């Protein structure tokens, strides 16, 4: 591993409609095969559904959903003398956001609604109300960390 300087963080350009960096990041995590325009269409469509159906401001619902899905703890495998332990560690702030976005996208795709816009809107509203599969994933991650608290002294 080279012992050079730390790699500088890339500047994230805010999305054109909401002028928000988190929305731009979420668009990128929603994107498949480089189709950014499609991803933006899905996200903005989902925001419109949230505004129309649920009569709430979509950017507020989005932020609340992200906050509710962000994990505080996770487990990492650590090998000690032939045995592998699941060691609970605190999640770095950037990784919290990245995991929350990834889980929201993953569990939106797995829902039963017809279009991706509807699925994403439903998952965002559920997550904002502390329901849904993405929130369940966060709770499972926390439970796993809690169950393996005994191995916390193996942290590095």
Curated annotation (Swiss-Prot):
UniProt keyword annotation of Transferase present: no
- State the GO CC annotations: small ribosomal subunit
Q: Organism's domain of life?
A: Bacteria
- InterPro entries named among the record's database cross-references: Ribosomal_uS7, Ribosomal_uS7_bac/org-type, Ribosomal_uS7_CS, Ribosomal_uS7_dom, Ribosomal_uS7_dom_sf
Query: Which key words are in the record?
Result: Ribonucleoprotein, Ribosomal protein, RNA-binding, rRNA-binding, tRNA-binding
Check the record and name the Pfam families matching this protein: Ribosomal_S7 (PF00177)
Entry's family note: Belongs to the universal ribosomal protein uS7 family.
Its function, per the record, reads: One of the primary rRNA binding proteins, it binds directly to 16S rRNA where it nucleates assembly of the head domain of the 30S subunit. Is located at the subunit interface close to the decoding center, probably blocks exit of the E-site tRNA.
Q: How does it assemble?
A: Part of the 30S ribosomal subunit. Contacts proteins S9 and S11.
Q: What is this protein called?
A: Small ribosomal subunit protein uS7
Native organism is Sorangium cellulosum (strain So ce56)
């Amino acid at each position: 591993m080279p012992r050079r300087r730390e790699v500088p963080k890339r500047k994230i350009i805010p999305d054109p409609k909401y002028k928000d960096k988190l929305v731009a990041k979420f668009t990128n995590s929603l994107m498949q095969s480089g189709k950014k325009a499609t991803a933006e269409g899905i996200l903005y469509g989902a925001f419109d559904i949230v505004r129309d159906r649920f009569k709430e401001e979509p950017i507020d619902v989005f932020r609340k959903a992200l906050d509710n899905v962000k994990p505080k703890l996770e487990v990492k495998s650590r090998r000690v003398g032939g045995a592998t332990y699941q060691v609970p560690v605190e999640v770095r702030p950037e990784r919290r956001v990245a995991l929350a976005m990834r889980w929201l996208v993953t569990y939106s795709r797995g829902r039963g609604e017809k279009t991706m816009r509807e699925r994403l809107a439903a998952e965002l509203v559920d997550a904002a109300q502390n329901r849904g599969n993405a929130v369940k994933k966060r709770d499972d991650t926390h439970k796993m960390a809690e169950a393996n608290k005994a191995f916390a002294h193996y942290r590095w």
